[in-house]
Swiss-Prot record:
This is Large ribosomal subunit protein uL10. One of its GO terms (biological process) is translation. Forms part of the ribosomal stalk, playing a central role in the interaction of the ribosome with GTP-bound translation factors. GO terms for cellular component: large ribosomal subunit. Belongs to the universal ribosomal protein uL10 family. SUPFAM superfamilies: Ribosomal protein L10-like (SSF160369). The lineage of its organism: Bacteria, Thermotogati, Thermotogota, Thermotogae, Thermotogales. The keyword Ribonucleoprotein applies. PROSITE patterns: RIBOSOMAL_L10. It comes from Thermotoga petrophila (strain ATCC BAA-488 / DSM 13995 / JCM 10881 / RKU-1). InterPro entries: Ribosomal_uL10, Ribosomal_uL10-like_sf, Ribosomal_uL10_bac, Ribosomal_uL10_bac_type, Ribosomal_uL10_CS_bac. Keywords: Ribonucleoprotein, Ribosomal protein, RNA-binding, rRNA-binding. It comes from the Bacteria.
Length: 179
């Protein structure tokens, strides 16, 4: 059992984390073994290092920490056993994908992913799947570069064609004058 002082430290720590995090995802973890949760944590650690954590915290402590971090509308997420995923560094969408796919692979009820906050905006359990299907930031950057690059490549091709035609015309004029 935690002492009051330990609980206050947890609330203070979680409040500071929630103030700077880009993602908070609440999940029901019942039915998973310790080995399962260790596997999930190692997948997150592999991708994010210390930038993401999946942590089991008492609802009363989460409630106080979220209140201190000035979040609103989180009460519905704090029913039943709750684990919290938070991301402080890296792409938050990728973390949602990791957890979503983990629950899917373990054949867990996906509605147990309760919802949370992405970049400060609240999302529900129904929206977790949509977020998991979004492209990552890296994929979005690649798509953007491809879209920007395509017209430039086309322009270069057109301009080189015009220059090539100009060279052909000049060669034809030169040959005609030399006759």
């Amino acid at each position: 059992m935690l002492t009051r002082q330990q609980k206050e430290l947890i609330v203070e720590e979680m409040s500071e984390i929630f103030k700077k995090t880009s993602l908070i995802l609440f999940a029901d973890f019942l039915g998973f073994t310790v080995a399962d949760l260790t596997e999930l944590r190692s997948k997150l650690r592999e991708k994010y290092g210390d930038g993401a954590r999946f942590r089991v915290v008492k609802n009363t402590l989460l409630n106080l920490a979220l209140k201190n971090a000035e979040y609103e509308g989180y009460e519905e997420f704090l029913k039943g056993p709750t684990a919290v995923l938070y991301v402080t560094e890296g792409d938050p969408v990728e973390a949602v994908k990791i957890v979503y796919n983990f629950y899917k692979d373990k054949k867990a009820d996906l509605s147990r992913l309760k919802g949370g906050f992405l970049e400060g905006k609240k999302f529900t359990a129904e929206e977790v799947e949509n977020i998991a299907k979004l492209p990552s930031k890296e994929e979005l950057y690649a798509m953007l570069v491809g879209r920007v690059k395509a017209p430039i490549t086309g322009l270069v091709f057109v301009l080189s064609g015009i220059l090539r035609n100009l060279v052909y015309v000049l060669n034809a004029i030169k040959e005609k004058k030399s006759e």
